[in-house]
């Protein structure tokens, strides 16, 4: 009798992924398939643990195993590359994971940790202008591709075993995660107005710093736009020193 290889392969893979809900192939030794199962799962488990260290730290062993196993059993990765498993894990958390017992910030924390990994392996090089530009207000500026402005409901950069918020604060958290000239990934907490200013620069790289700050002042409804422009200039100078922004090409 011929063996349907694809059917046998599917049967084998189903058990490897989810042994609690799929029977082991009857013609494979239990010791052998258990070894394969542990090998596959441990590879995924170790990769997730190394890329989401804070998430791993705040979950006990049972919680972590259940989360990793749920991902391993149910998610169908679209990429064959190990380096893209963290992004696949994010897609799983956003679209497939449905566990009322999860921390409410779980997805945001995972995204924040993924950003650090993604920036660390990004192919772009950090580039700094040779000097602080004169009359920065008249310059066109752009946000570095290695600087990502982010907004979260939870203060994800503070989450730790000793700080596990159960409700989102009244105000969101705004961050820039960026890679510097030494290829170190850093973060900077910013104000909502700084976040909006960077958004303006990203939306239109032909706008000058002054025009961007004027737009910000108009949107804020501030009684003294000159104050916004002066404060904004100081912020831009700081961001430029950190290579978060640079002169537009």
What spans do the regions from the language model cover?
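Residue-level marker of regulatory loop/turn positions in helix-turn-helix DNA-binding domains and
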Residues: 33, 189-190, 224
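Short acidic, hydrophobic short linear motifs in intrinsically disordered regions
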Residues: 206-217
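Short helix-to-turn junction characteristic of helix-turn-helix DNA-binding domains
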Residues: 200-205
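Basic amphipathic alpha-helical segments that dock to polyanions
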Residues: 231-243
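Short, positively charged loop/turn segments that connect secondary-structure elements
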Residues: 218-232
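Hydrophobic packing positions characteristic
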Residues: 73-196
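N-terminal, charged low-complexity regulatory/assembly segments
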Residues: 1-122
């Amino acid at each position: 009798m011929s063996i349907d290889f694809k059917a046998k392969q599917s049967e084998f893979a189903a058990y490897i992924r989810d042994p609690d809900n799929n029977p082991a192939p009857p013609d494979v030794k239990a010791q052998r398939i258990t070894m394969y199962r542990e090998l596959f799962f441990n590879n995924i488990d170790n990769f997730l643990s190394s890329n989401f260290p804070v998430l791993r730290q705040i979950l006990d062993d049972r919680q972590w195993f259940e989360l990793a196993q749920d991902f391993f059993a149910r998610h169908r990765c679209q990429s064959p590359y190990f380096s893209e498993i963290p992004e696949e894990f994010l897609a799983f958390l956003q679209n497939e994971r449905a566990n009322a017992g999860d921390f409410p910030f779980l997805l945001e924390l995972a995204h924040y940790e993924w950003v650090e990994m993604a920036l660390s392996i990004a192919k772009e090089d950090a580039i700094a202008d040779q000097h602080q530009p004169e009359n920065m207000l008249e310059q066109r500026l752009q946000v570095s591709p290695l600087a990502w402005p982010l907004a979260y409901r939870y203060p994800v950069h503070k989450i730790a075993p000793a700080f596990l918020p159960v409700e989102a604060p009244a105000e969101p958290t705004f961050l820039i995660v960026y890679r510097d000239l030494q290829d170190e990934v850093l973060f900077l907490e910013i104000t909502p107005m700084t976040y909006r200013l960077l958004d303006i620069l990203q939306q239109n790289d032909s706008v000058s710093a002054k025009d961007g700050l004027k737009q910000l002042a108009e949107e804020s409804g501030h009684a003294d736009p000159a104050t916004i422009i002066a404060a904004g200039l100081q912020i831009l100078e700081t961001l430029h020193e950190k290579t978060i922004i640079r002169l537009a090409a």
